[in-house]
């Protein structure tokens, strides 16, 4: 047994000396991904060999960029009667050399050709023009399809000296697709061919397709996701770009002019080819403030569709939690990692950047809430006069505090109710229950958040 231990120690000493004096170079991300690709690794090597053979060093560098960050890229499709079966196809196992080479060559062609993107650095080009995919859509020839479809138009705009902004909104006005509820039945990120077939899509589909069209002619268009609006329900997807003069623009993908409803969101996340897949860009859109709370390990949530939804975790240091870049003018709920209230009151982050914490309830004090309406965004909803509606107040969670039948088809009255400072009205149907927004009373006025 002692002899066995001696040999183990000796082998360990030999291994240590070999590691110190003859170190083995660690596997690079490029080598790792080619290995992870298995049999398909030869397709990736073909791409690199192609550009070595042609002597195009810059294209080879950019091909390396794509392969290095390819390990987290995949197509996700759905099958089954109700599209219940999710199929994930990693790009490392599926991508072909010819496909990647064509994408790289076409991306370089527009980068070198059109004035609106010639100022981009190689790094900016790699991040905002070069990628062959944006999200988890199928691997397809969208770049070739849209470039050859719109090449003549883009050439004419370039000859006329059009700016990046002019090109974007010319295309949106002339060729923009429509929002269609028909596309809601499809799960996941759609093929560009399906979007062309149905003539449009949801916000997410249209933002993806707009980026495909624009990048095919050298416009570095971003896809920016708003998981939740701040004062209305649901979420959204914007497109954005920074023009030749460094000015930031954002718009809905179906807008025909550079204007939009300025619905503030608590967080905006930009989709990236690199890892991590999302980059927070809220401060590019809205005035923001850092908020510090006197407890550790907190998250911050927003209220959307009847639930508290975590926006992001905070950063804990010295027993305190800091939330970076919170949009001003919105209502926030401090929660734990499971989205449960933790005793810290919600707060409204003022336009001056100062948190205004919701005061504790005063149940012994009563208030009158008269002439109340229910809304779908800004549209007043018709009430069911035979149904009861519930008023809830916040006290480390929503508490039922009163009920009422409608006074008429549009109006509710809640008389002599406990003063809970933060309220929400719940209806008897899921739609009405989920769509109502919290509100506070400011004097005799109702202010919704």
Task: Indicate where each model-derived feature is located.
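Short amphipathic beta-strand segments in non-cytosolic proteins
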Residues: 296-315, 388-403
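Secondary-structure boundary elements
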Residues: 29, 35, 42-46, 54-198, ...
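A short, amphipathic beta-strand motif
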Residues: 283-293, 300-302, 310-313, 333, ...
């Amino acid at each position: 047994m002692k002899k066995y231990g001696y040999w183990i120690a000796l082998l360990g000493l030999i291994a240590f000396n070999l590691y110190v004096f003859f170190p083995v170079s660690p596997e690079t991300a490029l080598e790792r991904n080619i290995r992870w690709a298995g049999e398909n690794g030869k397709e990736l090597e073909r791409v690199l060999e192609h550009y070595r053979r042609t002597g195009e060093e810059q294209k080879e560098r950019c091909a390396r960029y794509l392969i290095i960050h390819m390990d987290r890229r995949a197509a996700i499709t759905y099958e089954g009667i109700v599209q219940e079966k999710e199929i994930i196809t990693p790009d490392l196992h599926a991508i072909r050399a010819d496909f990647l080479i064509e994408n790289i060559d076409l991306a370089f062609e527009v980068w070198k050709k059109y004035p609106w993107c010639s100022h981009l650095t190689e790094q900016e080009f790699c991040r905002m023009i070069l990628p062959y995919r944006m999200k988890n859509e199928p691997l397809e020839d969208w770049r070739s399809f849209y470039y050859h479809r719109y090449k003549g138009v883009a050439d004419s705009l370039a000859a006329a000296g059009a700016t990046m902004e002019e090109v974007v909104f010319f295309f949106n006005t002339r060729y923009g697709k429509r929002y269609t509820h028909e596309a809601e039945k499809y799960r996941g990120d759609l093929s560009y061919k399906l979007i062309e077939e149905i003539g449009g899509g949801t916000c997410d589909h249209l933002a993806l397709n707009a980026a495909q069209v624009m990048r095919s002619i050298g416009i570095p268009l971003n896809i920016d996701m708003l998981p939740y609006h701040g004062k209305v329900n649901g979420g959204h997807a914007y497109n954005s770009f920074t023009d030749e003069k460094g000015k930031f623009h954002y718009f809905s993908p179906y807008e025909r002019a550079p204007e939009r409803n300025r619905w503030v969101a608590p967080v905006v996340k930009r989709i990236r080819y690199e890892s991590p897949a999302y980059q927070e860009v809220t401060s590019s859109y809205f005035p923001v403030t850092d908020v510090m709370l006197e407890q550790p390990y907190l998250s911050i949530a927003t209220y959307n569709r009847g639930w508290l939804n975590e926006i992001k975790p905070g950063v804990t240091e010295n027993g305190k939690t800091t939330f970076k870049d919170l949009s001003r003018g919105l209502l926030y709920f401090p929660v734990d990692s499971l989205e449960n209230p933790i005793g810290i009151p919600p707060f409204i982050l003022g336009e001056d950047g100062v948190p205004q914490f919701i005061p504790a309830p005063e149940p012994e004090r009563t208030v009158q809430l008269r002439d109340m309406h229910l809304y779908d965004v800004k549209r007043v909803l018709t009430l069911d006069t035979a149904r009861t509606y519930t008023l809830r107040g916040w006290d480390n969670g929503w508490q039922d505090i009163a009920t009422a039948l409608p006074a008429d088809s549009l109006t509710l009255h809640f008389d002599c109710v406990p003063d809970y400072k933060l309220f929400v009205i719940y209806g008897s149907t899921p739609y009405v229950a989920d769509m109502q927004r919290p509100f506070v009373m400011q004097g005799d006025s109702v202010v919704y958040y």
